[in-house]
Amino acid sequence: MARISGVDLPKKKRIEYGLTYIYGIGLFTSRKILDATGISYDKRVADLSEDEVAAIRKEIQEHYMVEGDLRKEVSMNIKSLMDLGCYRGLRHIKGLPVRGQKTKTNARTRKGKRKTVGAVSAAANKE
């Protein structure tokens, strides 16, 4: 089993799809890496030689940010937006959609479970 950037690639899959198991590498990037290293897309992960795995590893380390480094950079970017106090940062702080979606009826994934408002105040008024 090939291990690249701390991720075990599935043996039976073709290498172009196996590389997409690494955070930060999609199909397009996977194909760019394989073109740069001269490895066929059709090759299975199990059929790769140690030299080919080393070439892929080297290409990824030199030209791409993946896994932990990429996750850290994304979270730092979000944190800097929040620290700046810009609109996008405030939306992140409030847990609302950031990219302009409507929130009157949708956005349940981002807002979480519904909170009933009227029933709580009605029960408090009876006492």
Curated annotation (Swiss-Prot):
Residues 101-116 have a biased composition (Basic residues). One of its GO terms (cellular component) is cytosol. Residues 100-127 are annotated as: Disordered. GO terms for molecular function: rRNA binding; structural constituent of ribosome; tRNA binding. Signal peptide: none annotated. One of its GO terms (biological process) is translation. Keywords: Ribonucleoprotein, Ribosomal protein, RNA-binding, rRNA-binding, tRNA-binding. Located at the top of the head of the 30S subunit, it contacts several helices of the 16S rRNA. In the 70S ribosome it contacts the 23S rRNA (bridge B1a) and protein L5 of the 50S subunit (bridge B1b), connecting the 2 subunits; these bridges are implicated in subunit movement. Contacts the tRNAs in the A and P-sites. HAMAP family: Ribosomal_uS13 (MF_01315). Part of the 30S ribosomal subunit. Forms a loose heterodimer with protein S19. Forms two bridges to the 50S subunit in the 70S ribosome. Belongs to the universal ribosomal protein uS13 family. This is Small ribosomal subunit protein uS13. It comes from Campylobacter hominis (strain ATCC BAA-381 / DSM 21671 / CCUG 45161 / LMG 19568 / NCTC 13146 / CH001A). The lineage of its organism: Bacteria, Pseudomonadati, Campylobacterota, Epsilonproteobacteria, Campylobacterales. The gene is rpsM.
